[in-house]
UniProtKB/Swiss-Prot annotation:
Tissue: Expressed in most regions of the brain (at protein level).
Compartments reported by the entry: Postsynaptic density; Cytoplasm
Presence of keyword Cytoplasm: yes
Coiled-coil region list: 75-107, 158-189, 261-287
Superkingdom of origin: Eukaryota
One example GO MF annotation: molecular condensate scaffold activity
Assembly mode: Interacts with DLG4/PSD-95, GRIN2B/GLUN2B and SYNGAP1; the interactions facilitate condensate formation.
Protein name as it appears in the record: Protein FAM81A
Gene that specifies this protein: Fam81a
PANTHER family, A to Z: PROTEIN FAM81A (PTHR22420:SF2)
Function: Facilitates the interaction and assembly of proteins within the postsynaptic density by promoting the condensation of postsynaptic proteins via liquid-liquid phase separation. Required for neuronal activity. Accumulation at the postsynaptic density results in enlargement of dendritic spines.
Length: 364
């Protein structure tokens, strides 16, 4: 025979300020458990009576059959044990139920006290809320009056803002027109300066080309003169050599014809002729060297003069170009400074106007 065990509820310390919803749930749990215990006790009692009926019927059968004392005693002992177990279980269940009833009483007392404190608090809260509602009504009336005055002020400020916005838009348009005019002037001045720079570059390049062609022509002329002088010197040298050879041949013929003459006279004549020839060669060499040196000096002098003239012309051209560039750069810089100053002034005026327009907006 198996007995049903009843679950007991653990003891918990219940505080006086317990929430009403939790107390109600605990009461419902206790009632459910009491019903469960009643059902189990009823089932156990029914089971005990059924066992008793079985024992009585078995004893009657054994008495009818005879010799069943021992078996009857065993059934009685088992029945007594079951009854004692049932009684013990019932005692335990009764104790548990008593404890649960005490806990329920404590919980109900705590819930009642909590409800009383809640009622007191609600009453005090209601009085406080009524005072707050009265204060809120007064503040709402005051705020409505302030809202009306602020709304009127906002409408007035909105009108002023629209008027100031129109004025600012017109001023911005005027400033934009002035800025566009200034930019167009700047573009025109820059284009004029660029055209001037291009013209000055072209003029300087043209002058440099002219100087280059002039220098090349002078160099070619000097080279032609040097070549002509060299060819003339070679021709003179060849002519003198031919004349000397002709004279030597003539002297050799004379010597052959006058072979019978005195050898001393011939030797004297030959020595005189050789001396004359030496003198003629020396004089020709001197003349050639004298002519070559002044020609070379003349050529070198002309080349140095041309070089000096070229360097002076180049220096003058560079000075003119640099002066033109510096004047152009100075004019561009001054124009840029003037434009930057004017744009800065216009920007400052616009910022001041925008700040003046933003002040009423921030106040709104």
């Amino acid at each position: 025979m198996h007995l049903r065990r009843v679950k007991t509820m653990p003891r918990h310390s219940q505080s006086l300020t317990m929430a009403p919803y939790s107390s109600v749930s605990l009461v419902e749990q206790l009632e459910d458990r009491i019903l469960c215990h009643e059902k189990t006790t009823a089932a156990l009692v029914e089971h005990a009576f059924r066992i008793k009926d079985d024992i009585v019927s078995s004893l009657q059968k054994m008495q009818n059959k005879g010799g069943g004392d021992r078996l009857a005693r065993l059934f009685l002992e088992e029945h007594i044990r079951n009854i004692t177990a049932i009684v013990k279980q019932l005692n335990r269940d009764i104790e548990v139920l008593q404890e649960q009833i005490r806990a329920r009483d404590n919980i109900s007392y705590g819930t009642n006290s909590a409800l009383k404190t809640l009622e007191m608090r609600q009453l005090s809260g209601l009085g406080d809320l009524r005072g707050r509602v009265a204060r809120c009504d007064a503040s709402i009336a005051r705020l409505s009056a302030e809202h009306k005055s602020t709304y009127e002020g906002l409408q007035h400020l909105n009108k002023e803002q629209q008027a100031a916005k129109l004025i600012l838009e017109t001023k911005i348009k005027d400033a934009e027109g002035q800025i566009s005019q200034l930019l167009s002037r700047v573009d025109l001045s820059i284009s004029e300066q660029s055209t001037k720079l291009k013209m000055s570059h072209r003029d300087s390049n043209h002058q440099l080309q002219l100087l280059d062609t002039k220098f090349k022509g002078t160099v070619e002329e000097l080279s032609n003169q040097i070549l002509s002088a060299r060819s003339w010197l070679q021709q003179e040298q060849e002519r003198i050599e031919k004349e000397l050879l002709q004279k030597i041949d003539h002297l050799s013929l004379i010597v052959k014809e006058n072979s019978g003459a005195n050898e001393r006279d011939v030797e004297k004549k030959l020595s005189q002729m050789s001396a004359r020839l030496d003198k003629i060669e020396e004089s020709q060499k001197r003349n050639a060297e004298g002519q070559r040196k002044p020609d070379e000096e003349k050529v070198h002098g002309r080349i140095s003069k041309l070089e000096l003239q070229m360097t002076e012309d180049m220096k003058e051209m560079k000075a003119e170009v640099n002066a033109g560039f510096s004047a152009i750069y100075e004019s561009i810089g001054s124009l840029r400074q003037v434009l930057e100053a004017k744009m800065k002034l216009d920007r400052d005026q616009l910022q001041k106007q925008i700040q003046q327009m933003q002040k009423p907006e921030t106040a709104m």
